Amino acid sequence: MTWWKKLLGEDGASDKVDYYAEGADLLREGRFHDALTSFRLALKEAPGDPVVLQQIAIAYTRIGQTEEASKTYRHVLQKDPTAAGAHYGLAYLLLRQGEADEAVQHLEAFLQNPPSGPDAGEHVSHARSTLAQLRGEPGNLFSDL
């Protein structure tokens, strides 16, 4: 981990480190605590960055700190009420807590401003399916296509 090498003063540690990219890599590897450390360092370089904060919330969720994850998602939404990722993540945390009504609001907000990108379709389909189930509608995922 780059932050560890930098702390120990190993060769190359003085180079500019992309803590966000490092955190994303660690998150993909399942090294959630290490990812959280890297994202916190990225946040120091870009205080309040909603993208970094959403990654922190994901890391919190993966290590079981769902209350911290919820707080972080809510903080993002205070800064940017259209942050699709925060609506998505918070919706599923709320569902785990039995807060279906509030989760519906966040799923609707997510679907009003869905993300684009390689993984977006999977998340949009999942949100549509979940919303249909919560509303008691038939689960036809392809009705909007």
Task: Give the label of every model feature segment.
Residues 12-48:
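Alpha-helical segment of the N-proximal tetratricopeptide repeat
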Residues 10, 41-44, 74-78, 112:
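Conserved structural position within tetratricopeptide repeats
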